[in-house]
Amino acid sequence: MRIGITCYPTYGGSGAVATELGLELARRGHDVHFISYASPFRLRGFAERVTFHEVTQLEYPLFEQSSPYALALAVKQHEVAKREQLDLMHAHYAIPHAATAWLAKQMLEHEGLGLKIVTTLHGTDITLVGQDPSYYTLTKFSIEQSDAVTAVSAYLRDETYRAFGCGDCEVRVIPNFVSAADYYPPSDDFWRERLAPKGRRVLVHVSNFRPVKRVSDVVKIFASVRKQLPATLVLEGDGTDRDLAEHEVDHLRLRNDVGFLGKVVNV
């Protein structure tokens, strides 16, 4: 098959899963085309049957405060789908990717061409962003207009039905995954001993450090754990709340017990 995949390229679960899925599809003989404003962070180097298409935007004074990225994305999705004869477009994260895929599909149908849309719901696109009044109607419409919809958990599926209704569409649960060939417990304690002294418990938090991830609360909870037993907190990732977490660590006098590793490609 010829498959288009649109995802956010930045550090985060939706982009990571989308990229790993695309790479595995390519290894199985499918042609995969990633479409986004930057190359996904998990897409490193050359991969056979994988092509990246960058979405470029017009720099114009009128758009200084509100660059219409979604429109540029829809145009690029239409362009790639038409030129590469895509069979389907897989939109990861409903806003705006499912909506722009639908717009691209309408342009293709106007030209006598078809395109199937698969939308995967990842979390905050439904529980936070999608339920905001500014996006609610469009999110509901995009889900209902998709040819297939998946969610990464049963909770997210149920929340989609509760918040949006979507009675006419089936949301299938396909949990996130990791490759057991690439991610497996080490055979020794080499890395563990470098993260924490022997005998200490190791707690790990991995995220993009956005407010919804509540990293400062993680630090506060760890402070309670630390009062009960020897432990080390390892924070992997970076984002807007990194400084807030650093401040909380210093405020609770946990600097010797908390490590910030920053962005780590292979966790």
What are these regions (language model features)?
Residues 108-118, 124-142, 158, 186-187:
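Nucleotide-sugar donor phosphate/pyrophosphate-binding loop at the beta->alpha transition
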Residues 150, 192-213, 219-226, 234:
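Conserved donor-binding/catalytic core segment of Leloir-type glycosyltransferases
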Residues 62-88, 98-99, 103, 133-137, ...:
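An amphipathic, basic-hydrophobic alpha-helix
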Residues 129-130, 161-162, 177-194:
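Acidic anion/phosphate-binding donor-loop and adjacent secondary structure
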Residues 7-11, 23-69, 239:
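N-terminal strand-loop element at the rim of the active site
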Residues 38, 155, 177:
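Carbohydrate-associated surface elements
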Residues 5-19, 213:
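A short, glycine/small-residue-rich beta-strand->loop->alpha-helix junction that serves as a flexible
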Residues 246-264:
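Nucleotide-activated donor-binding/catalytic signature segment of Leloir-type glycosyltransferases, i.e.
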